[in-house]
Amino acid sequence: MNSLKIPDFLIFSTISSVFHSKENLMNTTAKFHLTAAAFGVLIASSVYAETNQVYSNTVQAHNAPMTVIMKDGKIANILTDNRESPGVGKLAIANLSKKIIRNQTINVDNVTGASVTSMALKYAVKKNLEAAGADLSKFQTKLPKAQLKDTYSSEVVIVGGGGAGLAAAASVIEAGGTAIIVEKLGYLGGSTVVSGGGYNAVDPERQNRQNIDDSIDRHFQDTMRGGHNKNNPELVKKLVEEAPPTMHWLEGKGLGFGPKVRVIVGGLYPRGHGAEGGGYGYIRVLEKFIKAYPDKVKVFTDTQAVKLIKNEAGKVIGVLGKHDSKDVNFMASKGVIIATGCYGSNEEMRKAFAPYSLHADAQIYFPTKSNTGDAHIMAMQAGGVMQKNDNHAATVHLEAGAGSYGFLHVNANGERFMNEDVNTQSKSCSKELQPHGIAWTVYDSNWTQDVKKQVDGNLAGGLFYGQMWQPWGNGWNVEIEKASQAQHIKDGKVVVADTL
């Protein structure tokens, strides 16, 4: 089957706004703006009624302006023009809105993995009902749980509904088989859906247009060097050889890649391709393909895989899942594919297998509820063993603080301690060894022009630079970077020389 490797990447920004309405009580149109925050709580300010009503509430959730329309005392529609994470918050809002309208109740379960957005939506609808003078008790009907059978069977059972799991399911379809996807979150996409969507592959057609000389062997050597030659050469060889055809396979499914090639975040050489729609682009095209074959693939969300089922001979023949506290057997006649994420949110496993990762100051990538190492644990319980390395590879970088750029790095004693053009991992690990685990980047008033040269010229050894939210194919925005730096100065992450 084809392989799919997608780096996980997303940083959320914060947007503040309020709710407002200008209609009468029983035919109310209230527009709500859900405020972005890393950790969400619901905060309501004063609500008051006048002839031309205005309701002011603040909800900390994710970016989602929405309009709730009341008609004849009922919820008629919930309109959204939101800036939610594609495939996560947007999907949560769409699914919950349909349930609320269809059943005329706000007593619906949150979408697993999008709890903050789910709570914010229900809170917004509740405030609108109150504003309309509705009897809230009439909108509290508890919906019955969907009942699953004890056993489901297919040729292949896939644990995990992220990018890898959906790619596996699409490959099963193309091979003429049937599959079941078991996903513990309330939506498909996993970490891939909130990733930056960058894809490393040798692609002469695009690279030649930018006079970039590249080869499969060079990609192999760069990847080995990035892993300090601790990588498994056979796996790296397969990765770099399969990357181009898999990229074209995705294009055949409808995924577009921008024409400009650049150094991917943390990379060493300009062979990074940006997927249209970022990480959600992968999920969108793969999910669309799979949905076209409902007789081939069945998807079970909100279903936790808890154990691999083995026969008397010790062969894995299925997966024991749990859905709403009910045990469900998913049997596979031809095999089980484990396609889950990492264990970055499992502190016990990180202590055991990647203790260096515990030194990081922040975790900014994957949804914290998804990457908890469940499948790793299942596999070990079934007799599998973890890779025997001194430390499992963790993506650790400098950007929990201010942007590091490609400038002179010194420690707290003012001493230069490394070659600044090494890869991102080496920079980060070197910084951790310095006094207090802190490094400073030194640059002058021409820094914006210099950073632009780094970005445009694919320089700086794979440093994080430019805007993390910068769409692939768009230029580096000086004004955004200046605004970001102004905030860093306020936060004390950047110090201006003449203020010392």
Where are these regions (language model features)?
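Gram-negative bacterial Sec-dependent N-terminal signal peptides
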Residues: I15, F19, L25-Y48
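Active-site- and interface-proximal helix/loop "cap" or "latch" segments in soluble metabolic
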Residues: E50-L143
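Conserved N-terminal/central alpha/beta ligand/cofactor-binding core
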Residues: N107, V111, T178, Y187, ...
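A short, basic/flexible loop-to-alpha-helix module at the beginning of a structural domain
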Residues: K138-S153, G414
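Beta1/beta-strand and adjacent pyrophosphate-binding region of the FAD-binding site
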Residues: Q147-A164, I180
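Conserved beta-strand-loop-beta-strand element in the redox core of flavoprotein oxidoreductases
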Residues: I309-F330
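Glycine-rich loop(s) and the adjacent beta-strand/alpha-helix scaffold that form part
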Residues: S325-K326, M331-H397
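An anion/pyrophosphate-binding glycine-rich loop and adjacent beta-alpha core
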Residues: H376, V385-L500
